[in-house]
């Protein structure tokens, strides 16, 4: 367990000092890997906005009125799935992110749509889409909230990797007026259990923190150490995302004070010191425009999924950067941008971490 003294030591580090310490960590990598920053060219299948939680910061939730590309839907139509797959093939995307609200199948309107499409359960719908993607040489990465162990086990057969944000370990967020007041399954114990179950099943896993939703610096550090302990036990966390909160019109949550970029930079550097070179750190590039060089110097080595054809459904007002533009920024900053798959290389040959379905597809994709 992290001590208060250690947290204070991290807090008191200047950004310049952190950059020097991060450089020392990075220099422990081989020369070939030292300045490589990865990304995955992907597209998103936004399956359903219906969600059993009502997080105060969430714009994606079906309770928030929307129109246009990010309009609410009970269930994505079959025609749109096929259209996006066709476009994904044309753009040479190797990953499809399957996302939805949590447990949309509990809502009657979603159940009705599933029945119309001949599916008994939402998970059957996910398996169907994942199989369809694999048939088209696109690797699925599913992030649809907390799932039972058996459903995780089923999805592993058809997914290259999966994800669930820890978000925070702060209990304060569940108090009256907190962002998780009406979100019972955002309890840290429930999400930690899900992440551990993924570890037991040897699923290459993406997780991370939401920064600026009412938590304190010490909460961020505690959450990072929680993820480190889980990874030390199971070895399955392939990347940690540090995602800053961005305000959107219509959401209930209005922070007392807005997150400063320096706060995000600091926790990024601290995360690199905590994880060393064991786990890649990602900050979404569309949320840090103009500060990419600073984040590179403070330890990020991944930009995550970047889509040439679908929006960021969580932050629809923040367009993805052009890959060519990001490549130029990296080059000017002394880094090399490199495309990756939704499963990191080290997990491909790691015993038990990919199913036979995925193994076959990796051979044809590579």
What spans do the regions from the language model cover?
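Auxiliary Fe-S-binding modules of radical SAM enzymes
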Residues: 1-16, 20, 82, 89, ...
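Short, well-ordered alpha-helical
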Residues: 4, 8, 13-49
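Canonical Radical SAM [4Fe-4S] cluster-binding loop centered on the CxxxCxxC motif
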Residues: 37-80, 103
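Glycine-rich, proline-tolerant flexible connector loops at the mouths of alpha/beta enzymes
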Residues: 41-43, 69, 99-118, 246-252, ...
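Active-site-proximal loop/turn and secondary-structure-junction residues that shape catalytic pockets
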Residues: 43-45, 102-104, 144-148, 168-170, ...
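Short, composition-biased local secondary-structure segments
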Residues: 56, 97-101, 117-127, 167, ...
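Conserved Radical SAM active-site core
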Residues: 64-232
């Amino acid at each position: 367990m992290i001590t208060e003294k250690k947290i204070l030591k991290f807090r008191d580090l200047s950004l310049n000092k952190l950059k020097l310490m991060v450089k020392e960590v990075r220099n422990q990598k081989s020369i070939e890997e030292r300045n490589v920053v990865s990304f995955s060219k992907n597209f998103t299948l936004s399956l359903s906005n219906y969600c059993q939680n009502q997080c105060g910061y969430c714009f994606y939730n079906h309770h928030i009125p929307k129109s246009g590309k990010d309009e609410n839907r009970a269930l994505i139509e079959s025609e749109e799935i096929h259209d996006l797959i066709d476009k994904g093939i044309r753009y040479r995307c190797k990953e499809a992110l399957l996302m939805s609200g949590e447990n949309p199948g509990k809502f009657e309107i979603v159940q009705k749509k599933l029945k119309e499409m001949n599916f008994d359960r939402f998970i059957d719908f996910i398996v169907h889409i994942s199989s369809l993607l694999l048939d088209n040489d696109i690797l699925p990465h599913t992030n649809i909230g907390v799932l039972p162990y058996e459903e995780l086990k089923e999805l592993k057969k058809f997914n290259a990797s999966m994800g669930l944000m820890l978000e925070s370990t702060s209990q304060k967020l569940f108090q009256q007026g907190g962002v998780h007041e009406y979100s019972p399954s955002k309890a840290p114990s429930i999400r930690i259990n899900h992440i551990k179950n993924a570890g037991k099943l040897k699923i290459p896993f993406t997780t991370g923190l939401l920064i600026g939703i009412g938590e304190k610096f010490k909460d961020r550090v505690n959450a990072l150490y929680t993820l480190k302990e889980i990874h030390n036990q199971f070895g399955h966390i392939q990347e940690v995302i540090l995602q800053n909160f961005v305000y959107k019109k219509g959401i209930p949550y209005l922070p007392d004070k807005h997150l400063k970029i320096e706060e995000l930079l600091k926790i990024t550097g601290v995360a690199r010191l905590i994880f060393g070179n064991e786990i890649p750190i990602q900050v979404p590039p569309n949320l840090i425009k103009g500060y990419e060089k600073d984040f590179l110097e403070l330890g990020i080595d991944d930009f995550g999924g970047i889509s040439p054809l679908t929006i960021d459904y969580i932050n629809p007002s923040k367009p993805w950067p052009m890959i060519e533009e990001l490549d130029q920024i990296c080059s000017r900053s002394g880094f090399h941008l490199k495309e990756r798959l939704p499963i990191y290389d080290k997990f491909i040959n790691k015993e038990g971490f990919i199913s036979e379905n995925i193994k076959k597809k990796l051979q044809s994709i590579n």
